[in-house]
Amino acid sequence: DLTLIPYHGEHYADEKEIIRSQPKSGTTHFHGYASVSIVHDNQRFVVALRFVEKGESMQEIVAWLFDRLKSIGISIKRAYLDKGFCSVPVLKTLQRRKIKFIMPMPVRGKSGGVRKLFEASASYKTTYIFNSPKHGELKVSAVAVKKYSKGRYQRKGTRWFAYAVAGLPKAVEPHQVFELYRQRFGIETSYRQMNQVRARTTSRNPVIRLLLVGLAFILFNLY
């Protein structure tokens, strides 16, 4: 996952230390951190962490994280990635490494694109072709899930979800994909708890700030 922590100040040694994004906590400047959380024996652990610089691509970040897992001897059964990683370069990286995954497909615009998957009457499995002017086309397996919930979703109590997937057993039904992906929601809890225990500093040094984030995740793991 990728998280941005608001930063009020100037860069320490290089402008790449600061990422600009949507305003939060009175600033558009952030320090970025990428991490990997795993679930083992029904317990969640953060096992990899790195600082993210301005201009780094999602593909670079994902490749580094999986290389890190390999270097420390951790193998994964399936990766659950945030929709922010859903792009042709990242998907190609996952396919090339033969990684099984479930990843939401971002829905943009009012028609066309991923929204075409929502024209059916019920959930189903299909394929989808991503088109990138820079990185070309890529065909992936996809699952469209129609969820019903009284008073929870708009549009007469229904809402569609779309996922790019790889390596799913044939017996897995679309609604099960939705439930499987919900397993990653605990990542948000880990970041929230990390921020609760993270020591604050006035230092502009990104190495020190990365250390404090890492120590906070260690406390989370121990807890």
Give residue spans per PLM region.
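Active-site beta-loop-alpha junctions of metal-dependent nucleic acid enzymes
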Residues: 50-72
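Short, surface-exposed basic-aromatic patches at helix termini and helix-loop junctions that form
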Residues: 67-71, 91-100
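Basic, amphipathic alpha-helical segments enriched in Lys/Arg and hydrophobic/aromatic residues
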Residues: 200-223
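Active-site-proximal, Lys/Arg-enriched surface segment
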Residues: 1-40
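Short, conserved catalytic/metal-binding motifs centered on acidic residues
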Residues: 1-6, 36, 76-86, 101, ...
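A short acidic (Asp/Glu
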Residues: 9-11, 87-94, 112-116
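An anionic, glycine-rich sequence signature occurring as long contiguous blocks
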Residues: 97-189, 193-194
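Gly-rich Lys/Arg/Thr-decorated short loops/hinges at beta-loop-alpha junctions or inter-strand turns
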Residues: 42-49
